């Protein structure tokens, strides 16, 4: 059954076995092409979950991920993906910019793409990345030297993070606060924030 193959493909990508994951995806497409017995709702559900998987497989290339996430949202509508999706997509990173900035001169565009991508992706995983787009914007401001504006964006993100208990993104926000404090030579703030992280 096509439902059984999707979790396996997801695990292949999660463990870094991309070639094997792609082979499983080819098999899924073959199975879906031969299954004329599936009703339209089930087919949309399966294909929506598959598009989410393809998005996951293209991790950190936002220009490729974005079309997949739009297709996922359209196919799933307000339903959850067919398989559990525990990942926030942060992969234990302390910086969203570190994860998604790929090319010199593209920072502004990458931030814009992430601002479009993140609300869609977050809504598909139960809102577990709400506020991450604000952190990405704050990091962009930080690396361009706009420390005060970056700090304001971090506080906006923290309002969302605390409201929704988004602890996956909280650490990214605090680490950015530490970097801002370090740039200002504010050791008291750094000690306080490190105490929060502990």
Residue ranges and their predicted role:
Residues 1, 191-198:
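Short, intrinsically disordered, charge-balanced linker/junction segments flanking boundaries
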Residues 2-172:
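Internal alpha-solenoid helical repeat scaffolds
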Residues 139, 179, 184-188:
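Cytosolic nucleotide-utilizing catalytic cores of signal-transduction proteins
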Residues 149, 189-192:
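Alpha-helix N-cap and coil->helix boundary residues
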């Amino acid at each position: 059954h096509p439902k059984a193959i999707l979790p396996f493909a997801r695990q292949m990508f999660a463990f870094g076995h991309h070639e094997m994951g792609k082979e499983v995806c080819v098999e899924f497409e073959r199975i879906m092409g031969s299954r004329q017995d599936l009703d339209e709702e089930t087919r949309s559900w399966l294909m929506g979950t598959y598009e989410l998987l393809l998005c996951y497989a293209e991790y950190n290339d936002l220009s490729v991920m974005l079309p997949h996430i739009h297709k996922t949202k359209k196919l799933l509508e307000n339903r959850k993906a067919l398989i559990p999706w525990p990942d926030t997509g942060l992969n234990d990173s302390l910086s969203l910019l570190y994860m998604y900035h790929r090319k010199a001169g593209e920072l502004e565009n990458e931030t814009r793409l992430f601002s479009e991508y993140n609300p869609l992706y977050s809504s598909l995983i139960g809102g577990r990345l709400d506020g991450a787009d604000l952190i990405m914007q704050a990091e962009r401001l930080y690396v361009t030297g706009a420390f005060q504006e970056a700090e304001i964006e971090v506080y906006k993100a923290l309002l969302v993070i605390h409201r929704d208990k988004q602890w996956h993104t909280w650490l990214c926000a605090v680490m950015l606060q530490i970097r801002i404090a370090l740039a200002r030579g504010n050791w008291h703030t750094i000690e306080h924030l490190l105490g929060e992280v502990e």
